[in-house]
Design a protein with these regions (language model features):
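Alpha-helical transmembrane segments and immediately membrane-proximal extracytoplasmic
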Residues: 1-471, 475-496, 500-506, 566, ...
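C-terminal hydrophobic structural anchor segments
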Residues: 379-382, 530-534
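Short aromatic/basic micro-patch
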Residues: 458-461, 508, 526, 572
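Short hydrophobic beta-strand motif reused across regulatory alpha/beta modules
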Residues: 507-514, 572-578
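Short beta-strands and strand-coil junctions in structured, solvent-facing domains, enriched
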Residues: 505, 559-560, 569
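The conserved cystathionine-beta-synthase
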Residues: 475-492, 498-499, 518-521, 525, ...
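Structural signal for short hydrophobic segments within the conserved structured cores
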Residues: 471-475, 531, 536-539
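Phosphate-coordinating loops and pocket residues in cytosolic domains that bind phosphorylated ligands
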Residues: 198, 469, 516-520, 534, ...
């Protein structure tokens, strides 16, 4: 702790004595460096865990261990999450989007290291999920906590959060442009030109970390590419349509498989057993599903699909080219189940690497089938690589990220035109069937997803619990007019909730409605409150979104509405306080 304070003091001095813009630039270097180092630690952790498991008697060659290792990894992660993190981890990019929209870009401190540990164990033990989403969460947590530590406002804190995510993606793939585009497409709904510089700095620093420290075999590169020819364009368009449809299948299959685990929501170890065993059985049938899957992608890209059958049940039937093609197609279909078993079972990982795995297999399947049927001679390596962009674009709803990521990991822009064709075609196809990505659908259903629409973005950031006013004097349900007059005399409001002994709202009284009768003293003990109250024009629930609240105000024309939790009275929310809060948030989020 003293060591940390030694570095904190000069940063506090800089915070006080430099402009916010310059401090953000300095911060982007530090956030990028830290997130890049976190990515290095994660990749190294997975590598050494797998080396340890393979050490000795080459246990991974025995099929039984393919079942045991993923199960052990998931159980270990569930145990660690319950013991170290109170059972709360918050997986995937969706958790960061939720933090941006609902928590003012405040990410829990433990996420700076918890996702490195848990995803490293998951993937290291053979869990069929990617490391990219966990490193996005880790980088985002680093940026968010840095901004909170130095008292940055919401807008700048969100920018540093995105810087951490950009650095994480850049470090994992050694692809800084893709890191920047990912932050813009997925995390930042409203971006200004000035925000590009910190994002670029963080991404470059993160990529340099991985390039300097990591050995080349721990990074994924694609280099066996064919030459692009104009005659291939129709086939790339078809591949775009196919990857778009496969992306729809991937997303819907993931949601349905995940729904199977809902009965075990409160039974984490049983859920882990079910997910781990099902994953292990799938890996026994399809060994390439073990781990992230980049090894299988490399085999396809280098033209060695026969090696995928090694140790599989189909190896007994030889390496017939149709058999190999069918196996590749089956891998593309079952990968989503393996990934969902891993994550829903309690492991930690994301859909980034699995999307690339499926895309590579779809691209290879398509091109190999065309070649075998002698429809047209297609470069299988190129179609394998471009297929990754198609599925990534469709599943993540991030077409620009997909294009530039694949361009960067393939070492150039030879395939830029086919990448753009396939990515755009797949994205257009998916948007027709699924307007939201795999990570954002649940947030959208809850009304918690930020969009490029500034009005909706501000409304989604606003939360009803911060707007409830409790200075309205309640009146007892059994009260008389005399008691009501006493309440009016000590109140600054002209609206009075009527509640019973259980604090349940029974009605409301407006001062205008009782102004005449309140001066007739002879009726003070004869008239009851129940005779004077009326039903509110509408009620606001404590968990309503601000869009729902504003709709109720528009429909009723009211200026104040009661807020209830169940039937319990909490207070009132006023249209004027909403407008005041809205204006402040609009200034805070846009800087205007």
């Amino acid at each position: 702790m003293p060591q940390f304070r030694k570095y904190k003091i000069p940063l506090l001095w800089l915070r006080r004595h430099t402009s916010t813009r310059n401090f953000i630039l300095i911060s982007s270097v530090l956030v990028g460096l830290t997130a890049g180092l976190a990515a290095v630690v994660l990749k190294t952790l997975v590598h050494y865990i797998q080396q340890l498991l393979a050490y000795g008697n080459r246990l991974l060659e025995e099929p039984v261990w393919l079942v045991v290792f993923p199960l052990v990894g998931i159980l270990l992660v569930v145990f660690l999450v319950r013991v170290m993190f109170n059972g709360q981890l918050g997986r995937g990019t969706a958790s960061i989007l939720h933090s941006i929209s609902q928590k003012s870009s405040m990410v829990e401190t433990h996420k700076m290291y918890s996702h490195v540990l848990t995803s490293g164990i998951t993937a290291g033990f053979g869990g069929s999920a990617g490391l990219e989403s966990p490193i996005v969460v880790t980088g985002s947590a680093i940026g968010s906590n840095f901004g909170r530590e130095y008292h940055l406002n919401y807008r700048d804190r969100t920018l540093l959060l995105a810087c951490g995510a950009a650095a994480g993606i850049a470090a994992v793939f050694n692809a800084p442009i893709a890191g920047v585009l990912f932050a813009i497409e997925v995390l930042l709904t409203d971006i200004s030109i000035s925000a590009f510089i910190p994002l670029i700095i963080s991404a470059v620093v993160g990529a340099l970390c991985s390039r300097i420290i990591l050995r080349e075999e721990l990074l994924f590169f694609a280099d066996q590419l064919g030459v692009f020819a104009a005659s291939h364009v129709p086939f790339y368009i078809l591949l775009g349509v196919l990857t778009g449809l496969m992306s729809v299948y991937y997303s819907r299959a993931a949601w349905r498989v995940e729904a199977l685990f809902e009965p075990f929501q409160d039974q984490p170890y049983r859920r882990a057993l079910v997910g781990g065993i099902l994953l292990g059985l799938l890996i026994m049938l399809f060994p390439p599903l073990f781990g992230e899957g980049y090894g299988a992608v490399k085999l396809l890209e280098s033209g060695k699909p026969e090696a995928l059958l090694q140790d599989s049940w189909l190896s007994f039937f030889g390496t017939n080219e149709w058999l190999v093609l069918g196996f590749v197609g089956m891998l593309a279909l079952v990968k989503v189940a393996a990934t969902t078993f891993t994550i829903a079972g309690g492991g930690n990982g994301g859909n980034f690497a699995p999307s690339m795995f499926v895309g590579a297999h779809v691209g290879f399947f398509f091109s190999r089938l065309a070649n075998m049927l002698q429809i047209h001679k297609l470069p299988e390596g190129s179609f394998t690589v471009v297929g990754m962009a198609g599925i990534l674009s469709g599943v993540m709803h991030a077409p620009l990220t997909a294009v530039f990521l694949i361009a960067e990991i393939s070492g150039g822009y030879t395939l830029m035109i086919p990448l753009m064709i396939v990515s755009a075609s797949a994205y257009a196809m998916v948007k027709y069937f699924e307007p939201f990505s795999l990570d954002t659908k649940k947030l959208a259903q809850k009304g918690e997803l930020l969009t490029a629409n500034k009005d909706r973005t501000v409304l989604r950031i606003m939360q009803i619990r911060h707007l409830v006013e409790t200075d309205f004097q309640p009146v007892r349900y059994s009260a008389t007019l005399r008691e009501l007059v006493e309440v009016i005399a000590h109140s600054r409001r002209n609206l009075y909730p009527v509640v019973d002994e259980q604090q349940k709202l029974r009605g409301i009284i407006l001062l205008e409605d009782v102004r005449e009768i309140m001066f007739k003293q002879e009726k003070y003990d004869k008239v009851l409150v129940t005779e004077l109250m009326s039903a509110p024009p509408a009620v606001v629930r404590h968990n309503d979104t601000m869009a729902e609240v504003m709709k109720k105000f528009d429909e009723t024309g009211a200026w104040n509405l009661p807020v209830l939790k169940g039937e319990l009275y909490l207070g009132f929310v006023s249209k004027s306080s909403i407008f005041t809060k809205y204006r402040k948030l609009l200034i805070k989020t846009t800087g205007n």
